[in-house]
Amino acid sequence: MAHDTEALEETSVVKFKNQDFRFLRDRCLSRGQLFIDDTFPAEASSIGQKLLMGKRLPKLEWKRPQDLSFGPPHFILEGASRFDIQQGRAGDCWFLAALGSLTQNPQCLQKILMNQSFSYQYAGIFHFRFWQCGQWVEVVIDDRLPVVGNNFCFVHPRRGNQEFWPCLMEKAYAKLLGSYSQLHYGYLPDALVDLTGGVVTRINLHSSPSDLLMVVKTAVQTGSMVACATPKWLTEESEVMENGLVSQHAYTVTGAEKIQYRRGWEEIIRLWNPWGNTEWRGRWGDGSQEWWETHGSRKSQLYENKDDGEFWMSCRDFHENFSCLYICSQFPITMDPGVTPNESWRQMRFKNQVISGNTAGGDGRDIQYLFDVQEPMDGNNVIVAFTVMPQSLKTEEWPFPLQFQVFKVDSQFQKFQKRLPPAFFSQFRDAAQGIDYVTKRNFTKSFHLSPGTYVVVASAHGKEVEFLLRIFLKMPHKDRNPNSSFNLKALKGSLSENESPKSSFHRYMDQGLDIDASQLQSLLNQEYLTGPPGDTFSLDQCQSIMALMDLKVNGRLDREEFARLQSRLIHCQHVFQHIQRSQGVLRSSDLWEVIESTDFLSGVLLSKELLSLMTLRYSDSSGRLSFPSLVCFLIRLETMSKAFRNLSKDGKSIYLTEMEWMKLVMYS
């Protein structure tokens, strides 16, 4: 019986099938050969029977990109984007929708794609990384792709057959799972987890919260992966319906907004179809009456009438036509009323767990995991997430081999540290939750549990199963002020006598002496800022703050730079709380008073025209400013004013070369 795990270490990378990319590449380069992958051969077995039935096998060929491209092939051309992807014959929209979402987080995407090309050290070999049961697995492939004639069997390159990263990544994922057939009709959360190592929150759209728009918008802005699926229609196969949607199909959620329409406001959500075409034909779709009746800068910001698979639709239509929404992030997102996306969670992780094949029924209760719930809380406070190794499963196996129960442990049994005795599992004992069958490779279950000690008991149907178990425990917000919409805690007031701001800062340092933008985002949202969805610091805002405060121009903040930022955050909080019209809301008309009340802006000159432009830049469509937007505005105003004074010789004008100007405006 396990009671806890060690602190989460940096996950090592495992070589799939023991293939070392650098060794294989260097050997091919030294021999002047292009790599041929014998572990995933250019044969029908790599396609799989499910996709070969009735297909023209004699005409199937495997060709390298240089034999298919209309020009020099590229791995990535002008940046990786969801619009580079176009689904082929395999029903792998579940994987491609997840991949499309990942392209919106370039930092995470780069960890999977890595730096590769068709020019530097090209040897016909590529490698990609996927997350499998608590560890990253590196998959090596050759670049031979299945075609009939010169038509791609699976994912198509979009730009003149020149950009090949989606095709090669799809092949690597097919190799990981066994064949291209294993990509044919899968489970969307599996791909979300395999691409990130995150945990998936499933939202039933028929009973979703009223603030779904804000939840989705915040999730997209903070780099979480968001995707959704349509239900089955009349047939078992996916088909295009009259409204333009595809049944049994996965879509990427790429944005959510509120837009002024006629005399009111309309909530709209943006989706992308992995087919690369075939869009919604209803309200707010491309070319719809709603867009014709919408004018101004807001329309130009949001709307493009392109046949690229991306479209807007109203949230009401989204609820009616989609069955479920999935949000994948490093920690769970609960949908309880009043809960913010920056809830604090503690994770217990149990890797490489194996249930032997001879455990079943009552005898299967020898895999046990203890955890404690410390304090009472509203809403779901425990998340149990199982990830089963694909090799433990057979195609379309049912019943699924793994099941689990959660029991509360009485005080008289808490002395047992290694194993609860059979007497604990008497026929009169009720589980905190009935038997849960792990029906998918990635299965997540939420619980609302009272304080006490609990045990997760896993068992199998007489089969050996390898899995990862993660238990997420919600931590109390001891420093939250229940009477305020947000609370940026001044560090000096919350630290003990023996603790300094620098030691608090140490908790967020990545084994060095500074932090990057993503760590800054975590620090601001999880430690200092609590508020409604949408009022948290986005990654883009943190990158902007980072550039403004980064005196050394290295993309990170050191101790002194962070201390400088901290003092401004605390001052911004005081100004915001003093001037706000209502809790958590500042009107753009209050900006003059804000600037006059901000000490670190002393001496800054501002015209009414410039202030009007800043109002357009930093306020929302209803003229309100969130606290993060205000921070970005004030810090940028200070930085640019100081830059002018430092560069000006007469206090009236400055002279810059083109490169000096570009550096100033592009990285600040």
Swiss-Prot record:
Functional description taken from the UniProt entry: Probable non-lysosomal thiol-protease.
GO molecular function ontology, one term from the record: calcium-dependent cysteine-type endopeptidase activity
PANTHER family with a match to the protein in the record: CALPAIN (PTHR10183), CALPAIN-13 (PTHR10183:SF333)
Protein name: Calpain-13
Organism from which the protein derives: Rattus norvegicus
The EF-hand domain, residue ranges: 537-572, 635-668
Cellular component terms (Gene Ontology): cytoplasm
Matches recorded under CDD domains: CysPc, EFh_PEF_CAPN13_14
Similarity field: Belongs to the peptidase C2 family.
Domain named Calpain catalytic: residues: 34-331
Enzymatic class: hydrolase
Domain of life, per lineage: Eukaryota
Keyword terms of this UniProt record: Hydrolase, Protease, Repeat, Thiol protease
SUPFAM superfamilies documented for this protein: Calpain large subunit, middle domain (domain III), Cysteine proteinases, EF-hand
Catalytic residue positions: C93, H249, N273
EC assignment: 3.4.22.-
GO biological process terms on file: proteolysis
InterPro entries linked to this entry: Calpain_cysteine_protease (IPR022684), Calpain_domain_III (IPR022682), Calpain_III (IPR022683), Calpain_III_sf (IPR036213), CAPN3/13-like_C_EFh (IPR054069), EF-hand-dom_pair (IPR011992), EF_hand_dom (IPR002048), Papain-like_cys_pep_sf (IPR038765)
